[in-house]
Structures are given as C-alpha cells and as structure tokens.
C-alpha cells in the first residue's frame, strides 16, 4: 500500500484513472483511502521525516562529489487552483535541507518565454545533480492553455 513502505511501479499503475473516469464525478473534498484528521496523518507519516532528510542529504552530497553522474529528483504537481499543490510541496520539502532543493511555480508565460518552444522555460529549472526540484504545475498546462486559447481567438 502507498505510504506503508517502498513505492513500487505497481503502486503507480494503480493510480491510473479507468476508461469510464469522469472528472465531474469526483468530489473535490474527498480523501479516499484515509479517514482521519491532519494530525492523524502527520502522526502516521512522521517516522519518514528522518529517513527523507538523510536520503536528501546523501543525494546532495553525492551531487557535490560526483557532479556529472549523480542522480537528481524532479517532483511535478499538476492540479487545479487551490488543489493543495503548494501546501503539499511545503509539507514534504519541510524535512529537507533547503540548500539541496528548489521549488518552481509556473504561471502565465512571459513575452521572452513565448518566443521559445514550450519546454524552454521548463528546461532552465531542471534539477542539477544531487538536487530535488518541485514544479508547481508543468508544461502540460502551457500546451493545453495556449492551444485552446489560440483556437478561441481564431473563432
């Protein structure tokens, strides 16, 4: 089960939406799989804090020692406004050493960003070796918004 050990590929595959999934049917206030308060949740996952801190510290040190071959981590949160992306990032990243992390929010593209391909503004924030980076939103939204917006302009 997720949150009860190592996260496996099978866990990720279980998170996929089925063929008949409709976003209209989702209750945005629901917390499926968890019945409890915020403090219950914090208590349930508190034992991971030290492990996460140590793993991030080793990752960062490895990045400093073996810059080119060291791994990095990119966390991408995509969701509607007020869906809790920023809160999730703040909560998870609160256990990390800030010098090995970076959080990037993507809003409306600037004029300079619009002059380049849609991944240009994303690539400049890719994690360097040993770094953990969180993206608050992603390039998927850029592609969707720009295409839908441009198609509406041309109607």
Regions flagged by a language model, labelled:
Residues 2-51:
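Charged, amphipathic alpha-helical linker segments immediately N-terminal to NTP-binding catalytic cores
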Residues 63-71:
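Phosphate-binding P-loop
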Residues 77-92:
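Glycine-rich phosphate-binding P-loop
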Residues 85, 112-115, 141-147:
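Switch/connector loops and helix/strand junctions flanking conserved nucleotide-binding motifs
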Residues 94-98, 112, 124-128:
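Conserved catalytic network of the ASCE P-loop NTPase/AAA+ motor domain
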Residues 99-109:
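Short beta-strand-centered segment that lines the nucleotide-binding/catalytic pocket of NTP-utilizing
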Residues 130-132:
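Loop/turn-to-beta-strand initiation segments
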Residues 153-155:
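Conserved small/polar residues in nucleotide/adenosyl-binding loops
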């Amino acid at each position: 089960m997720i949150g009860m050990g190592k996260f496996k590929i099978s866990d990720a595959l279980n998170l996929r939406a089925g063929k008949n999934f409709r976003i209209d049917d989702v209750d945005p206030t629901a917390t499926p799989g968890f019945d409890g308060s915020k403090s219950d949740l914090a208590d349930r996952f508190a034992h991971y804090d030290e492990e996460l801190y140590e793993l991030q510290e080793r990752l960062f040190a490895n990045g400093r020692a073996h810059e080119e071959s060291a791994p990095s981590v990119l966390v991408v949160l995509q969701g509607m406004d007020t869906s809790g992306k920023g809160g999730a990032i703040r909560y998870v990243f609160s256990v990390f050493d800030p010098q090995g992390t970076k959080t990037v929010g993507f809003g409306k593209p600037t004029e300079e960003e619009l002059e380049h391909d849609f991944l240009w503004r994303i690539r400049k924030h890719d994690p360097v070796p040993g770094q953990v980076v969180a993206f608050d939103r992603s390039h998927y939204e850029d592609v969707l918004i720009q295409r839908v917006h441009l198609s509406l302009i041309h109607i």
